[in-house]
UniProtKB/Swiss-Prot annotation:
It holds the Pfam family ABC_tran. It catalyses: Ni(2+)(out) + ATP + H2O = Ni(2+)(in) + ADP + phosphate + H(+). Residues 2-241 form the ABC transporter domain. GO terms for molecular function: ABC-type nickel transporter activity; ATP binding; ATP hydrolysis activity; nickel cation binding. Keywords: ATP-binding, Cell inner membrane, Cell membrane, Ion transport, Membrane, Nickel, Nickel transport, Nucleotide-binding, Translocase, Transport. Its EC number is 7.2.2.11. The gene is nikD. This is Nickel import ATP-binding protein NikD.
Amino acid sequence: MPQQIELRNIALQAAQPLVHGVSLTLQRGRVLALVGGSGSGKSLTCAATLGILPAGVRQTAGEILADGKAVYPCALRGIKIATIMQNPRSAFNPLHTMHTHARETCLALGKPADDATLTAAIEAVGLENAARVLKLYPFEMSGGMLQRMMIAMAVLCESPFIIADEPTTDLDVVAQARILDLLESIMQKQAPGMLLVTHDMGVVARLADDVAVMSQGKIVEQGDVETLFNAPKHAVTRSLVSAHLALYGMELAS
């Protein structure tokens, strides 16, 4: 399994250019946070990595490398990169139970799909009464439960890399805290490389090792999390950090 995945000079276009020469490096055991405002190109960059660009959007330049070798995104998706999506409700087939979802995921990847394995993954993400959960349909579960189920699927995949696209969006504060606890636990136990897409600098401060700031389809600043919080250089980064500090009655040093 690869130890590093690199996005090199990725450019995306629809009727007009959307993403301009984005380069990012994911490393096993480290969390790279990709931050920026809505419409900055974060989710499109993730979609390009997975080879699931929306209709009308095409990649016009760049490549993806695994341990320095060029690869097609379809060779990474699911097998080498698991995904935790922004809206879990749209990620599950409403006609299938959680048992069917989990079992089919395992079988597709050649992983054990016995009930004991599925139950262990459910319990690992803090969902009580795994036997009952596995019988539920998506519409019978809350957003927080579905997000934890999606994380359980990522655990079952045992992929060396994870893309978590706004994993705490639209969840209440308690559910958000539980999701962050789970992501921390995955990093400690499995040490994948994680691309964490978020606009919440509090999430960045808690989970990230490195940060890339995106604005208008470009990476405007990259660095380790401590440097970026203490000495942000770009105006967009300074605005994000200042807004975060203001929540605690603090100001960014000039």
